[in-house]
Amino acid sequence: MQVFELTRQLIDIESVTPNEREIGDHLWRLLSELAPRFGGTAERMAVEKDRDNILVHFGNPVVTLSTHMDTVPPFFPSREDETCIWGRGACDTKGIIASMIVAAEQLLENGIRNVGLLFVVGEERNSAGAHIAAQTPRGSKYIINGEPTDNKLALGSKGALRYEIVAKGRMAHSAYPELGESAIEKLLDALERIRRLPLPTDSILGKSTLNIGTIQGGRAPNVIPDSAMAEIFIRVVGDVTALRGAIEQAASPEAEAKEVLFIPAVHLGSLDGFETTVVAFTTDIPAFGNAWGQPFLIGPGSIHVAHTSEEHILKSQLIEAVEIYKRLVRILLQ
């Protein structure tokens, strides 16, 4: 298979979470054709209705190459120029899927076995596919998780801690504000206290960061608002036990902090001869746990263009990624 052609082929299949059926079917066809050529076994791993992980392994999968097949919205099709391939999922992670498949095919052609490919659904929302895969391990000792790291081996990734901050008030005519209670003012006070909280730091992963992502509330300009809500997202490092308590305390008494998501930060191993980096985004690695073996995180593309209208991937990085994945597999099989 040719990595540029396969990358564009995959980009042109819309797979915004949770609409992975078509790309799953396409990968199933590709891997079902690859498997018998080299004595492999292809499997569909049901996650939800019309949503399957796709797995192929050749012998016992000591090393598994894995990434996700879903993307964020909105879909836009592929195009290319001399240096780049553009389109939704180009770097996150259709180009990575293509690089992994091509690398695996070339390894197999050279007699390498005990390798697997695992492509999962739902990473962009809740890692549903990785959670299901973690319940049905296949004995893999190492999992190479693909995300856009500019082909550098990540030493770790920050976690995620998300809250809804909810405030309640009492409606009144805005001409007589003393007769009501403004939920928005309560929310703003709570958010200001949360913004001032010290956040955990880590010697490798750096500082935690906080984003107030959405604010909702109020009914009309001439009505004292009776409800307001904000969503905050913290890219966390280190132990978050104290931070959780501090957020709940800072929100009260005017508001309530409701935790809706937690993904822990992870530290990852390094290998001699690979450039390294640290990433602030979350991945499927915490959802896999250790079910598919020791994790490594590396892939072509820049996270800085992922999720944007300018998403693209360098052709040179796709070619480099094929060689990097082949080299990693050979090292880990030793």
Where are these regions (language model features)?
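Acidic/histidine-rich catalytic neighborhood of metal-dependent amide-processing enzymes
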Residues: 98-162, 202-203
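Short, conserved micro-motifs enriched in small and acidic residues
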Residues: 87-98, 124, 181-184, 312-315, ...
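Short glycine-aspartate micro-motif
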Residues: 55, 64, 85, 141-145, ...
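Glycine/serine-rich anion-binding loops at beta->alpha junctions
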Residues: 73-74, 84-99, 173, 298
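Acidic/His- and Gly-rich active-site-bordering loop/insert found
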Residues: 1-90, 112
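Metal-dependent amide/peptide-bond hydrolase catalytic core
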Residues: 15, 148, 155, 161-334
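Phosphate-handling active-site elements
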Residues: 81-83, 103-118, 194-203, 315-316, ...
